[in-house]
């Protein structure tokens, strides 16, 4: 499995620091319980961070036309009608996916279309599974207009541990399912806002896989 480009710098830095710490400890105290304990913790820490930045190759295996595909790995924590007052300014169906630190944290475009809007807003860093995180945490918004003229809003939300949201989408560019929309580092959430009345294909607490699980079907 590949390492995501967002993690290469951090992993190299972490490896260098851990290597120096362990070599210094070895030459200072030699082999012993302290050295082996630190070496074990260092290995586990590096493997955990490496696992977080894994970048699996994924292709949606079916015709994606009219479908909304999960933009992230995680658990469905919200399926509800809400007023979206920041970007779309209308009532929408919100589907929210919470990503734990053990999930892949790459984000994919949920639909095919043209990027209409991209924005970033600073905010708090409360736990991403809380409903208020959608409007109070640091977040980035991407609006995609489908071929049929439907606006779909995908919002990347930072969590309690996530301090950096990366968004690759650019206004005016064509986007497709199978392409990465961005990346969120360390525990986070993605909300998708759809027209009211959209057919929902998932249920609460369901585990979904980014760019693999259909979560809704847009009306024709």
Swiss-Prot record:
InterPro entries: PS_Dcarbxylase, PSD-A. PANTHER family: ARCHAETIDYLSERINE DECARBOXYLASE PROENZYME-RELATED. It catalyses: a 1,2-diacyl-sn-glycero-3-phospho-L-serine + H(+) = a 1,2-diacyl-sn-glycero-3-phosphoethanolamine + CO2. Is synthesized initially as an inactive proenzyme. Formation of the active enzyme involves a self-maturation process in which the active site pyruvoyl group is generated from an internal serine residue via an autocatalytic post-translational modification. Two non-identical subunits are generated from the proenzyme in this reaction, and the pyruvate is formed at the N-terminus of the alpha chain, which is derived from the carboxyl end of the proenzyme. GO terms for molecular function: phosphatidylserine decarboxylase activity. Disulfide bonds: none annotated. It comes from Parabacteroides distasonis (strain ATCC 8503 / DSM 20701 / CIP 104284 / JCM 5825 / NCTC 11152). GO terms for biological process: phosphatidylethanolamine biosynthetic process. It holds the Pfam family PS_Dcarbxylase. Belongs to the phosphatidylserine decarboxylase family. PSD-A subfamily. Catalyzes the formation of phosphatidylethanolamine (PtdEtn) from phosphatidylserine (PtdSer). One of its GO terms (cellular component) is plasma membrane. Its EC number is 4.1.1.65. The record marks 187-188 as: Cleavage (non-hydrolytic). It is an enzyme of class 4 (lyase). Pathway: Phospholipid metabolism; phosphatidylethanolamine biosynthesis; phosphatidylethanolamine from CDP-diacylglycerol: step 2/2. Heterodimer of a large membrane-associated beta subunit and a small pyruvoyl-containing alpha subunit. The active site is at 188 (schiff-base intermediate with substrate). The modification Pyruvic acid (Ser) is found at residue 188. This is Phosphatidylserine decarboxylase proenzyme. Binds 1 pyruvoyl group covalently per subunit. Its main location: membrane. It is found in: Cell membrane.
